[in-house]
């Protein structure tokens, strides 16, 4: 009787531990996926029909930052 009770309790503990571990390993992947999915919306059309770069996008003469951004290797919000 004690062995079967121990087996049931041990099974529940293992099941909970596996579920918790699965959640822990899934969370970073979901975070990365959400970062990349959200980053696809960072480009916004300019008046001329070209796209401007938003915050943390690399910029140069061809890839200009949006109007409220300043280009310093990547686009940063203008202060002031």
Curated annotation (Swiss-Prot):
One of its GO terms (molecular function) is ion channel regulator activity. Residues 1-21 form the signal peptide. Residues 22-50 form a propeptide. Expressed by the venom gland. It comes from the Eukaryota. It is found in: Secreted. Keywords: Amidation, Disulfide bond, Ion channel impairing toxin, Knottin, Secreted, Signal, Toxin. One of its GO terms (cellular component) is extracellular region. The modification Leucine amide is found at residue 79. Disulfide bonds join 52-66, 59-71, 65-75. Belongs to the neurotoxin 30 (phrixotoxin) family. The presence of a 'disulfide through disulfide knot' structurally defines this protein as a knottin. This is U4-theraphotoxin-Spl1a. It comes from Selenotypus plumipes. The lineage of its organism: Eukaryota, Metazoa, Ecdysozoa, Arthropoda, Chelicerata.
